[in-house]
């Protein structure tokens, strides 16, 4: 057993509550020890919605266990009286699993109508966030989806959008805009914003769209099997993937429409998808070919995220921005085979599959890429290494739950991602200029005073600031002149240059790094 902290995936409760908190008229009762309802704070802090999380806790106490009683029936009655939900989902905890409590039996004695209760008996020890969320959503679809008359006009369902989803609202807005441009109606978005009645209407649509591999795909497969509803599983991240996504939707809708005599849908002019209706829908194709972006072809990137994002970002960085992907990975072991198939030919080595952020940080430190696309964990790791990092996937923090329109999906999303890649790699240039040029002659007296203070401090410690030596991270000694030259290297690649120079010096049998050794290392490494 190892200490669990900084987890990439939350518990099964996280997944269950992401589904129920997304929906209208659905409530979760968590049968667990007091304190396990901390998850409500996550939603109130990050979600930025006026509603309080639809989650209550049925406390498991030692005294109750000793007396052979359970608070679950009373809690269910209180939830029914106070919230009047259409459905209450009862979620087990590790404690109830260890105690082997029969939640169905306890729920049956609550006095609440059984059709308004659902025990989602997932194993809390083995099942984590995404699997629990996908499983519960699929169970809800199986329970409530019903045969109905098909929509008279082309209509689709958007599946897998959940509470705490990455850039959720902006991604939905981007998809709605593109579908509206096609003349396609959105029948139901689920689970986000959907009620029980909306789940019943799912089969009325012509097509299901499930862009996330983690959540929604299984439900779409069930609807395809039971109601003969075709589905599109592609993720529209990037310009070319978005075009393929649109063509796939048009093709499948026209197949359905041909059976009911509907007029075929055709691809509109591309400028119709732009925000102003007049220009190209995305600036990425020409932006990637500008002189400024051409230099990105030599930059190295590392990606670590959930399955959907890892696949999409690796392809976007290489295919559309021309960057060199030196490695990629995911923390979702159950989706690793799918990621491997999707990224065949894209990676120089094996896909990294781990849920230990320390292992990911070690790879980043060894590779020293120019850009990392990852999670909140990689943001922290890269901050210590002075490596640019952009968060592209859960787990995230509050700065990734924005009020503005910053989608990752669609043409608009391609522009947002390209901007962030560019800024993440370029930000810090002003810091380098200050490092390089100093105060440029401004506030000269303060600069002299600071220099004198530094000289005095160095002398007091027995060091010679001008000609002294320092020891590098690898144990290699650097002369003062070599250190001064190293400081002229931009800070965001300085660590890499130091490491490469020390490696060169050791290979050449040098005992210390001098200016001459530094210059030879630079020439040898093509710098």
UniProtKB/Swiss-Prot annotation:
Gene3D superfamilies: 1.20.89.20, Nitrogenase molybdenum iron protein domain (3.40.50.1980), Proto-chlorophyllide reductase 57 kD subunit B (1.10.8.550). InterPro entries: ChlB/BchB/BchZ, LI-POR_suB-like_C, Nase/OxRdtase_comp1, P-CP_red_C, Protochl_reductB, Protochlorophyllide_Rdtase. Pathway: Porphyrin-containing compound metabolism; bacteriochlorophyll biosynthesis (light-independent). Its EC number is 1.3.7.7. The active site is at residue 292. One of its GO terms (biological process) is photosynthesis, dark reaction. Its cofactor is [4Fe-4S] cluster. Binds 1 [4Fe-4S] cluster per heterodimer. The cluster is bound at the heterodimer interface by residues from both subunits. [4Fe-4S] cluster binds at residue 36. It catalyses: chlorophyllide a + oxidized 2[4Fe-4S]-[ferredoxin] + 2 ADP + 2 phosphate = protochlorophyllide a + reduced 2[4Fe-4S]-[ferredoxin] + 2 ATP + 2 H2O. Protochlorophyllide reductase is composed of three subunits; BchL, BchN and BchB. Forms a heterotetramer of two BchB and two BchN subunits. This is Light-independent protochlorophyllide reductase subunit B. It comes from Chlorobium phaeovibrioides (strain DSM 265 / 1930). The lineage of its organism: Bacteria, Pseudomonadati, Chlorobiota, Chlorobiia, Chlorobiales. The gene is bchB.
């Amino acid at each position: 057993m190892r200490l669990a902290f900084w987890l990439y995936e939350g518990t099964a409760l996280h997944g269950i509550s992401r589904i129920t908190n997304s929906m209208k008229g659905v409530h979760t009762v968590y049968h667990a020890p007091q304190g396990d309802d901390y998850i409500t704070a996550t939603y109130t802090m990050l979600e930025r919605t006026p509603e309080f999380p639809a989650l209550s806790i049925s406390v498991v106490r030692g005294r109750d266990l000793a007396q052979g009683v359970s608070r679950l029936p009373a809690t269910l009655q209180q939830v029914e009286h106070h919230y009047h939900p259409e459905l209450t989902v009862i979620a087990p905890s590790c404690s109830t699993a260890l105690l082997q409590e029969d939640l169905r039996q306890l729920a049956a004695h609550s006095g609440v109508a059984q059709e308004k209760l659902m025990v989602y008996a997932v194993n809390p020890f083995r099942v984590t966030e995404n699997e629990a969320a996908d499983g519960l959503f699929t169970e809800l679809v199986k329970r409530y989806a019903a045969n109905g008359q098909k929509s008279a006009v082309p209509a689709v369902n958007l599946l897998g959008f959940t509470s705490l989803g990455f850039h959720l609202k902006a991604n939905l807005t981007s998809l709605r805009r593109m579908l509206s441009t096609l003349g396609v109606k959105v029948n139901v978005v689920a689970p986000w914003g959907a009620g029980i009645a909306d789940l019943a209407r799912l089969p009325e649509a012509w097509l299901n769209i499930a862009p996330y591999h983690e959540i929604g795909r299984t439900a779409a497969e069930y609807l395809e099997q039971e109601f003969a509803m075709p589905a599109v599983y592609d993720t529209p991240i990037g310009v070319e993937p978005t075009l393929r996504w649109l063509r796939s939707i048009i093709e499948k809708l026209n197949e359905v429409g041909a059976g009911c005599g509907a007029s075929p849908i055709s691809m509109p002019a591309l400028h119709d998808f732009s925000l102003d209706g007049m220009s190209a829908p995305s600036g990425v194709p020409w932006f990637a070919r500008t002189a400024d972006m051409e230099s990105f072809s030599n930059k190295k990137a590392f990606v670590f995220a959930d399955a959907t994002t890892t696949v999409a970002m690796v392809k976007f960085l290489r295919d559309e921005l021309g960057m060199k992907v030196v490695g990629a990975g995911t923390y979702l072991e159950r989706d690793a085979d799918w990621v491997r198939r999707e990224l065949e030919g894209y990676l120089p080595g094996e896909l990294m599959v781990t849920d230990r952020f320390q292992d990911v940080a070690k790879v980043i430190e060894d590779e020293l890429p120019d850009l990392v696309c990852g999670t909140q964990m990689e943001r922290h790791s890269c901050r210590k290494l002075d490596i640019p990092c952009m968060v592209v996937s859960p787990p995230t923090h509050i700065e990734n739950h924005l009020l503005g329109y910053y989608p990752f999906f669609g043409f608009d999303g391609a522009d947002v991602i390209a901007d962030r890649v560019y800024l993440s790699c370029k930000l810090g240039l002003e810091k380098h200029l200050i490092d390089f040029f100093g105060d440029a002659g401004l506030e000269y007296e303060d600069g002299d005073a600071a220099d004198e203070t530094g000289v005095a401090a160095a002398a007091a410690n027995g060091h010679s600031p001008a000609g002294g030596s320092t020891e590098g991270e690898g144990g290699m000694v650097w002369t003062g002149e070599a250190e001064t030259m190293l400081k002229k290297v931009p800070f965001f690649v300085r660590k890499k240059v130091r490491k490469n120079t020390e490696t060169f010096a050791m290979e050449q049998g040098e005992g210390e790094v001098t200016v001459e050794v530094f210059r030879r290392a630079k020439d040898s490494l093509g710098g």
